[in-house]
Amino acid sequence: MADITLSKNPFVQQWLPGLLLCGLIASVTAAVAQVPGIARLGLGSLTLAIMLGIIVGNSVYSPLAGQCDAGVQLAKQKLLRLGVILFGFRITLQQITDVGLSGLLIDVLTLSSTFFVTCLLGRRLLKLDRETVWLIGAGSSICGAAAVLATEPVVKAAPSKVAVAVATVVLFGTLAIFIYPVLWPLVHDFFPRVTLTQFGIFTGSTIHEVAQVVAAGHSIAPETESSAVIAKMLRVMLLAPFLLLLSGVLRREQAEQQSAKPVTFPWFALMFVVVALFNSLHWLPAGWVNMFNTLGEILLTMAMAALGLTTRFTALRAAGYKPVLLGALVFGWLVLGGGTINLLVQRFIA
């Protein structure tokens, strides 16, 4: 009798199959991400989850779609938002004091200028659609794939556009892992006053993903890795105000156009800030914080798997070369423009 009751449970019938599939993909990619060779490349579970999700989605998923789609959509939407909220347990306000005013200013200037350059090049030069440009801009400016995922509910982009943006920021963020260690001796030769700690701030303020920042900083020096991670987490903290500003822009546009289409207010972004503020009080034991961090990583990985499952190769091919070209141009700006911002701020404010 219990089995019959369980099988008729709406949650089991509607959502559980898709959630289990996303959970299976997340588990596999989490294990693969721990392989030393993969970890050195900075390929985290989020990146691997969308890759495996796309492979499964374009091969064996079709016969399962009818049974799994509701759970997959739940993972892509609700679990994503919850994962972003729990991401707040990764940061504290104390990290702002660790990098100082100059570090905060560098992150703000780099983020805003990078997003502006992305919009300028993407819309004016390459004539790409606004959703793709904004997603690539968010991923390049803030925290890679996680920022792309967090921006998607605000701009309501198609899964294929999200996948293209993720692929773009992952590609050039991975290249940065190999380029930045080579850049350090060159920068030190031309600018002898630049310290390993300052180069770490440059690394954290310009490389896309947290895992990529860790990998690049670790390849240079311990002090570089430490300052890079702090600068990067401060950059992650700017995700919430970025999403709120983006939502405000869309709301203003809609009011001017008298559109009936609703704009989603990113409540999860506010909750992200609340969680970060709460985490700054250090009321929870470290074990609990680690548990919430792990749960948030699992939820985001499941959301990425769901995104991959709903992305089709035909849609990726239709995107063409322009998103990759935009990613390359923005990466160039991050290195050169971001480097210039770092030098000027550290010269006159630090």
Explain the meaning of each model-derived region.
Residues 39-55, 77, 99-113, 137-140, ...:
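Structural signature of hydrophobic alpha-helical transmembrane segments
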Residues 2-74, 87-95, 241-297, 303-315, ...:
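Structural signature of multi-pass alpha-helical membrane transport proteins
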Residues 217-258:
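Oxyanion-binding "anion nests"
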Residues 15-19, 68-82, 104-105, 129-140, ...:
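Cytoplasmic-side transmembrane-helix entry/capping segments in multi-pass membrane proteins
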Residues 22-27, 51-53, 76-88, 110, ...:
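Small-residue-rich segments of transmembrane alpha-helices in multi-pass membrane proteins
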Residues 128-176, 196-221, 295:
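Alpha-helical membrane segments and immediately flanking helix-loop junctions
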Residues 34-36, 93-102, 185-198, 218-227, ...:
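Helix-coil boundary and interhelical linker segments in multi-pass alpha-helical membrane proteins
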Residues 19-21, 74-76, 82, 87, ...:
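Entry/N-cap segments of selected transmembrane alpha helices
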